[in-house]
């Protein structure tokens, strides 16, 4: 059986580094798959056989990088922060020295004589002295990275920077040591110490800014982790004590006062309140909580005090599972990333070849070694595989994190990419378009009774039904509670299978059941036209009719059905506006299915479908060329969810359905479908923008650096500009990805 492990990686500088690690792990016997996420600095490895985590980390170490096993535990938000300072001592040193060198080189770069300029800065020996610590101390990480690539027979961005800056530095050293000889050969005795130092400093600065921006891409995870309270008020004997969350056990009872966060998942055993679940589930309205209802840890108790019996802790909690799913999605790769990986694998070697070719061409055609060295340095420095490597994962990280904020959990990056391409969506009726449980939809009484008299009938009905365990009885009780009636103590309760229930209140018999049963008991009015007409109308709508009689007289009718969710019609119309063909899937007969479909605005109805045939219906739509999403919540929906190109599970459904899905809507609100599709389109659009920026930057920058326009316009980049452009490219890609944080469905 295959196992999956997450590794935290250190030492990666660019996408080529990620490719090197991926290849190193893939060579380990027993490894089935490996995905390295450069932006997240993590690897997800599936393996079997005798392979162990230690063998995998050793493989990473041999490749020249560091790895440690990530334990699946919920960390505090502070622990997820990157402790590495944005402005390190090496960067500050580089900034100070580079500023001095740049200032000293201004007259040469501008080609003018500046009066009263301190000419000591022109001294190549001083420039050499100043540039050396930047080259070999501030820039030491580039040399270490380049040496790793030599050992592993690969090439990374560190290779390019080390080669480029070394060429400028050692060329300048040669000019400083042998100026007369070079001048006698007709070569310009210009040094480029400032170029080497400034390029290293700019790249270090770019990496620091990039690191800071990348930290923002994981803000959603830190926000989720920060929701978890650290302490709870727990009952110990006859006393209440404040303890750390880690000290709680299953079945402990905790008390949550108004305005406090609920510390754990559990069941209310005393009290009632409203709870704000928006930060966890995306549900915008407070949810009523009474005895017997479940609560989610990290949600906010609003109005009343609640005593909660702990049911889940640690990794079993809803919040922990949400965090784990978001991390899983952020560590995964979108299919488009595999295309980028193939390019970055050959990118650095290609750039080195182009740089050498530019050097040879300009030296052979002009005999100008300075020009040849400059083009070599500029090509090596301006090329940037980092921008390519960051283009996709940064957008995925922000997009999946944003989805979690709206209660949309995306398991894999591939689901984001596929959701953008959807052409059809299949909605299971029960539990998706409807509430998934019976509820009273209509109450009818013949005589013109007052509101008080109607409420009394509802109170009697709910009071009798409270003693029954039948699902229809629960619907009547819930209806009574929604009308805010209190339940009475009923005497002589009776339940007759297939007929109904009865009980006495103050000597009166109250009966609820079928018309035939009431007729057999001598109740009058069951055959009267007004009652029969209303009952027949509801039965045509596939509603269950319950007759309410007091003593020997019919008093009211109740209709019970699986009510349509209020948001269903609106969501269906919105899906159509997004260009999707909407289908309803149900086991109901055609007439019943069509009535519900007409109510919510669905034209395509797949009725009388047996549970085992749902996946086949999805497959038939796929065979017609559709990219299909399936939305469901039940066990019998799991095969169809797995068959669909994108399976979307309603979070209020079964664990089996959620496990088989690609996207989970935590709150169970259909609005989450729209959020998921709109988010996928926004994320994929952002990825394409990033890839365009990264590709166009390299496609234009490398030829310009190689001197393509020099013969026509005398245009040749300064190495400093090349370094600045390279640093800016990565920062711009990450900054563009951060725009997704403003996404609003």
From Swiss-Prot:
Top EC class for this record: translocase
Topology with respect to the bilayer: Multi-pass membrane protein
UniProt binding sites for Mg(2+): 633, 637
Family affiliation: Belongs to the cation transport ATPase (P-type) (TC 3.A.3) family. Type IB subfamily.
Annotated TM spans: 95-115, 126-145, 153-173, 194-214, 343-365, 373-390, 544-564, 688-707, 720-738
MF term (GO), any: P-type divalent copper transporter activity
Keyword terms, alphabetized: ATP-binding, Cell membrane, Copper, Copper transport, Ion transport, Magnesium, Membrane, Metal-binding, Nucleotide-binding, Phosphoprotein, Translocase, Transmembrane, Transmembrane helix, Transport
Biological source species: Synechocystis sp. (strain ATCC 27184 / PCC 6803 / Kazusa)
Name used for this protein in its record: Probable copper-transporting ATPase PacS
Residue span(s) of domain HMA: 3-68
Active-site residues, as the UniProt record annotates them: 428 (4-aspartylphosphate intermediate)
Catalytic activity of the protein: Cu(+)(in) + ATP + H2O = Cu(+)(out) + ADP + phosphate + H(+)
Ranges per topology, Cytoplasmic: 1-94, 146-152, 215-342, 391-543, 708-719
Residues that bind a metal cation: 14, 17
Any single Pfam family the record assigns to this protein: E1-E2_ATPase
Classification of source organism: Bacteria, Bacillati, Cyanobacteriota, Cyanophyceae, Synechococcales
Main location group: membrane
SUPFAM superfamilies: Calcium ATPase, transduction domain A, Calcium ATPase, transmembrane domain M, HAD-like, HMA, heavy metal-associated domain
Residues on Extracellular side: 116-125, 174-193, 366-372, 565-687, 739-745
Gene Ontology biological process terms from the UniProt entry: copper ion homeostasis; copper ion import
GO cellular component assignments: membrane; plasma membrane
Catalytic activity, EC: 7.2.2.8
């Amino acid at each position: 059986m295959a196992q999956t492990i997450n590794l935290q990686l250190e030492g990666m500088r660019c996408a080529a580094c990620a490719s090197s690690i991926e290849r190193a792990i893939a060579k380990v016997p027993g490894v089935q798959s490996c995905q390295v996420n450069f932006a997240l600095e993590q690897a997800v490895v599936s393996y079997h056989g005798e392979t162990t985590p230690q063998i995998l980390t050793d493989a990473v170490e041999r490749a020249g990088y560091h790895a440690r096993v990530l334990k699946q535990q919920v960390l505090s938000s502070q622990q997820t922060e990157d402790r590495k300072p944005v402005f390190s001592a090496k960067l500050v040193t580089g900034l100070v020295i580079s500023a001095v060198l740049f200032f000293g080189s201004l007259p040469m770069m501008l080609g003018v004589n500046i009066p009263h300029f301190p000419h000591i800065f022109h001294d190549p020996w001083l420039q050499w002295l100043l540039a050396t610590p930047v080259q070999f101390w501030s820039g030491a990480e580039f040399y270490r990275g380049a040496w790793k690539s030599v050992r592993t027979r690969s090439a990374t961005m560190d290779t390019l920077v080390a080669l480029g800056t070394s060429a400028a530095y050692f060329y300048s050293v040669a000019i400083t040591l042998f100026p007369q000889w070079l001048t006698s050969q007709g070569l310009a005795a210009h040094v480029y110490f400032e170029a080497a130092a400034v390029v290293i400093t700019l790249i270090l600065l770019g990496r620091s800014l990039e690191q800071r921006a990348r930290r923002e891409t994981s803000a959603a995870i830190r926000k989720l982790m920060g929701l978890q309270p650290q302490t709870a008020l727990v009952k110990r004997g006859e006393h209440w004590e404040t303890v750390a969350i880690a000290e709680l056990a299953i079945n402990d009872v905790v008390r949550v006062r108004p305005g406090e966060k609920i510390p754990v998942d559990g069941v209310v055993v005393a009290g009632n309140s409203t709870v704000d679940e928006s930060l966890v589930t995306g549900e915008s309205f407070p949810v009523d909580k009474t005895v017997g209802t479940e609560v989610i840890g990290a949600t906010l108790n609003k109005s009343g005090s609640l005593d909660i019996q702990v049911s889940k802790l640690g990794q079993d909690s809803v919040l922990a599972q949400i965090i784990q799913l978001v991390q899983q999605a952020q560590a995964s790769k979108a299919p488009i990333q595999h295309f980028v990986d193939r390019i970055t694998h050959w990118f650095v070697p290609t750039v080195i070849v182009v740089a050498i070719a530019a050097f040879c061409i300009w030296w052979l055609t002009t005999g100008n070694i300075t020009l040849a060295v400059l083009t070599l340095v500029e090509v090596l420095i301006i090329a940037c595989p980092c921008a390519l490597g960051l283009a996709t994962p940064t957008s995925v990280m922000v997009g999946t994190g944003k989805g979690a904020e709206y209660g949309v959990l995306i398991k894999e990056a591939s689901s984001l990419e596929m959701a953008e391409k959807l052409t059809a969506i299949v909605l299971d009726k029960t539990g998706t378009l409807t509430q998934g449980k019976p509820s009273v939809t209509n109450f009818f009484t013949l005589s013109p009774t007052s509101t008080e008299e109607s409420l009394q009938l509802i109170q009697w009905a709910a009071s009798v039904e409270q003693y029954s365990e039948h699902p229809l009885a629960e619907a009547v009780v819930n209806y009574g509670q929604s009308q805010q009636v209190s339940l009475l103590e009923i005497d002589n309760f009776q339940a007759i299978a297939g007929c109904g229930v009865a009980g006495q209140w103050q000597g009166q018999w109250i009966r609820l059941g079928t018309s035939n049963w009431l007729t057999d008991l001598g109740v009058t009015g069951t055959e009267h036209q007004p009652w029969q007409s209303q009952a027949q109308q509801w039965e045509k709508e596939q509603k269950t009719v319950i007759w309410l009689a007091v003593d020997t007289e019919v008093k009211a009718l109740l209709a019970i059905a699986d009510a349509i969710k209020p948001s269903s019609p609106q969501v269906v119309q919105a899906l159509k506006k997004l260009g999707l063909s909407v289908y309803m899937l149900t086991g109901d007969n055609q007439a019943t299915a069509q009535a519900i479909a007409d109510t919510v605005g669905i034209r395509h109805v797949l009725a009388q479908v047996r549970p085992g045939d749902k996946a086949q219906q999805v497959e038939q739509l796929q065979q017609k060329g559709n990219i299909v999403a399936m939305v469901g919540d039940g066990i019998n929906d799991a095969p169809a969810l797995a068959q669909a190109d994108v399976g979307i599970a309603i979070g209020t459904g079964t664990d089996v359905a959620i496990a088989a899905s690609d996207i989970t809507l935590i709150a169970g609100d259909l609005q989450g479908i729209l959020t998921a599709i709109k988010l996928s389109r926004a994320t994929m659009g952002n990825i394409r923008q990033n890839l365009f920026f990264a590709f166009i930057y390299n496609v234009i920058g490398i030829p310009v650096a190689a001197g393509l326009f020099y013969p026509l316009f005398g245009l040749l980049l300064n190495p400093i500009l090349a370094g600045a452009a390279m640093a800016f490219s990565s920062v711009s890609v990450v900054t563009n990805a951060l725009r997704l944080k403003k996404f609003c469905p």
